[in-house]
Regions:
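Extracellular attachment/recognition segments
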Residues: 66-160
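Conserved beta-strand and immediately adjacent loop positions that scaffold enzyme active sites
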Residues: 20, 57, 150-152
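Extracellular "spike/adhesin" assembly and maturation modules
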Residues: 1-36
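Glycine-rich, low-complexity segments
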Residues: 26-70, 160
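Intrinsically disordered, low-complexity regions enriched in Ser/Pro/Gly/Gln/His and often acidic
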Residues: 6, 21, 40, 48-51, ...
Length: 160
């Protein structure tokens, strides 16, 4: 019996071992079962609502039909001035996905700002074509304050 590699458990032989083609085929099956990145790049999609523009989504498609996408949105024209007391909020914004999705199973949003605040995911439960968010702040904002919203989405695409 040949030795095996640590990560995939592939069979390896010394030069004086007898090669068993059944074990070679097992190696190919183990490799074929691995999920690999089949495509990556950048695609654009629009966002609109409280703020509008074009999002550059960086993505990785995988051989099992899953996808990971992320984007960074930068705003100089958003302020948290909605509500009668803290937390104050911005208008809602919808960011479209550049791919048709059959399932979205993970969405993460993060905010970078000069003020104390956070970004709130207000996307509906069964929405598969976009995410919706509001920026929240503890202080009422009279002026526009530069903010960045980072969004990461994981899911399953329609056409593999």
């Amino acid at each position: 019996m040949p030795n095996v590699t640590k990560k995939l458990g592939l069979n390896i032989w010394l030069e004086n071992d007898i090669v068993d083609f059944e074990q070679i085929n097992e190696n190919f099956q183990k490799i074929d079962d691995c999920v690999i990145c089949t495509e990556s790049g950048i695609k654009t999609a629009s966002y609109s609502g409280g703020v509008s523009g074009t999002a550059n989504w960086r993505y990785k498609k995988y051989s099992d039909g899953t996808i990971e996408m992320s984007t960074k949105l930068e705003f100089t024209n958003i302020k948290c001035n909605g509500g009668s007391k803290a937390p104050y909020y911005s208008g809602s914004s919808t960011v479209q996905f550049p791919f048709s999705m059959s399932e979205v199973y993970d969405v993460q949003m993060h905010l970078a700002s000069n003020t104390i605040g956070w970004v709130s995911d207000i996307t509906g439960k069964s929405v598969l074509d976009s995410v919706m968010f509001r920026v929240m702040a503890m202080e009422y904002e009279d002026d526009y304050i530069y903010k960045q919203v980072y969004i990461t989405v994981k899911g399953v695409i329609d056409n593999v």
